[in-house]
Structure formats: C-alpha cells, structure tokens
Regions:
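A short, flexible beta-alpha/helix-coil linker loop
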Residues: 11-13, 45, 130-135, 168-172
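Short hydrophobic segments within beta-strands
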Residues: 8-10, 40, 127-129
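Helix-loop-strand module that forms the ligand-binding subsite of alpha/beta enzymes
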Residues: 56-148
Length: 192
C-alpha cells in the first residue's frame, strides 16, 4: 500500500555526505515501491527561529499541515555531541510541540499525563549516524539521541517508532561497508 512519507533532513551537507546517501537511497527505493515523498532539507529552508514562547509562524504551520498529510515521518541526522543536529532539534522543538503534537491532561497540580495529538498512531523513523563504534555508543553514552527522542518526543505524540543506526561512519569507510548500510536503508523502505 502506498504511503506518504515526510522526510526531514538535518545535515548541513545536502549533496555528498553519508546522510545524503541515506536520504537518496531511501527516496529512490520509496519511489520504486510507489510511496510519495515530501522532503525538507533543513539547511536549504528559511532558518527557523528558536523557541521563544511565541505562536508558531507560517513556516511551522506549513510543516505541520504537510506532516498531517503524511503516514510516516522520517528524520535523518548525524549524532553531534550526543544529540541530533541543532537544526533538527530546533525543528522538533518548534514543529512537534504542544498542542499540535501532544497536549497535557492535568489531574492534580502539575501531575497528569500526555495526550497524543495530530500524529497519533502513525509511524516515525529516526536515522542516526555515529562516528564511534556501537559498543562505546550504547555502553557508555546513555543519553544518546535515539532514546531521548523516542522515549520523550515521539512517545508523547503517540507515534510508533523505528530506528536505523549507523556506527563507525567515518571518511575512508570501505565500499563494502557503505553498500551494506545502503542495503539496510532499502530493506527499511520495504518494511513500511
């Protein structure tokens, strides 16, 4: 069944990076499988202001409208200092915000629970690439982005989350290893 996929790309190199290869392989395979793509390369967009308590502007409202039309949200970022890129984190803060993405049901005082909003029950995919190996990343660094984004943001919005992680993504990666990573991306698309 054809899906509408909203891709948010958060790497500064939109042409020749490993993350650009992930994006391009995903889009190519998705189109082969009949899916529709709505792509935002954040570094090619008008810069998003940082959250200051004001109401969302037209740019954020447009992102939300496009997101509401989608079946799948796919975010792509390298890991910088144990976080997604600042530009993607800012997009998350502004776009996947209350009361659009979730609201809060107060029970007593400040105690309560989140209520999923516009994207409830839809699928989210988070792609993260790391320069380090899987053992050091998963053993020593417990505040890694995929856990915080999944357990915090995406869970609040009621989304079903899938992760695809790439370790030891460094210049000089062998062609064989690169090809295996791209095959994982193609397999991911086939499971949508």
């Amino acid at each position: 069944m054809s899906k509408s996929i909203f891709i948010v790309y958060g790497h500064y190199n939109t042409k020749e990076s490993f993350n650009a290869s992930i994006r391009d392989a995903f889009i190519e395979e998705a189109k082969k499988n009949g899916h529709e793509i709505d792509l935002i390369n954040l570094h090619d967009e008008k810069p998003i202001s940082f959250y200051d308590g004001s109401e969302p502007d037209e740019q954020i409202l447009d992102y939300r409208k496009r997101l509401e039309k989608s079946d799948v949200l796919f975010m792509i970022s390298p890991c910088y200092n144990l976080r997604a890129t600042a530009i993607l984190e800012n997009w998350i803060d502004k776009t996947l915000a209350p009361k659009f993405f979730f609201s809060f049901k107060r029970i007593v005082g400040n105690w309560g629970y989140p209520i999923a909003g516009a994207m409830k029950g839809r699928r989210a995919i988070m792609s993260m690439s790391y320069g380090g190996n899987w053992f050091s990343i998963q053993t020593w660094f417990q505040n890694i982005p995929f856990r915080r984004i999944k357990a915090g943001v995406l869970k609040l919005g009621g989304m079903k989350t899938t992760y695809i992680r790439f370790y030891e993504v460094l210049p000089g990666m062998t062609k064989e290893k690169f090809a295996k990573h791209m095959e994982r991306v193609r397999k991911l698309v086939k499971r949508i």
